């Protein structure tokens, strides 16, 4: 791979892992994610955003809280923008576009790029015959937390599933941030005393093991 393609693949890997670690959010939400008031109020330890449902049957929105566990922090340092009030976390997704039609096209294209590059990583780097995507990451978030014994209400709330008609009814401090950290750390079986994961230093075998954890195969 030439250096430019390696850089694009590195960024796609980061966005793919961010989708998994950010409660399985989709790229449309990732593109709109900002360093808002909650991020700074929590000392850079959490994101809060309004998740727009992608289903044609639903126009509802719900509040999602994402604890910034250590591996996610590494990803943000690698491919995220520097924290500034109300700045986009992943500005590369929309690349400054404000028109919603164009944003949708860019999201579709970026989803395709991530899928293609992740599948090349799986096949050419890991020697692994797996087909992965953003949808795969979202399903893995729910499945792996369930297998880890996390209650289904937490999983549903974390993914922005409606808890009623009130847009804020799913949150209201139902889960303190420390509980969110404890639960989301189970996504990669992280213990408090463990060192942060450095994605760039992972060997192919270590990367394969991490992806296996995402698939719930351990």
Task: State the predicted function of each range.
Residues 32-78:
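Conserved tyrosine-mediated DNA breakage-rejoining catalytic core shared by Y-recombinases
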Residues 37-46, 129, 150-172:
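Short, polar N-cap/turn motifs at the start of nucleic acid-interacting alpha helices
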Residues 69-129:
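Active-site/catalytic core of tyrosine-dependent DNA strand-transfer enzymes
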Residues 1-9, 85, 115-157, 161:
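Short, basic (Lys/Arg/His-rich) helix/loop patches that form interaction surfaces
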Residues 70, 82-84, 94-101, 166, ...:
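C-terminal secondary-structure termini that scaffold catalytic or DNA-interacting sites
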Residues 51-55, 159-190:
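Catalytic-site neighborhood detector that most strongly recognizes the C-terminal catalytic loop/helix
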Residues 1-27, 31:
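Basic, Lys/Arg- and aromatic-enriched nucleic-acid-binding interface segment
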Residues 2-6, 52-67, 100-110, 128-136:
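Short, contiguous acidic/charged loop-to-helix segments that flank catalytic cores in large enzymes
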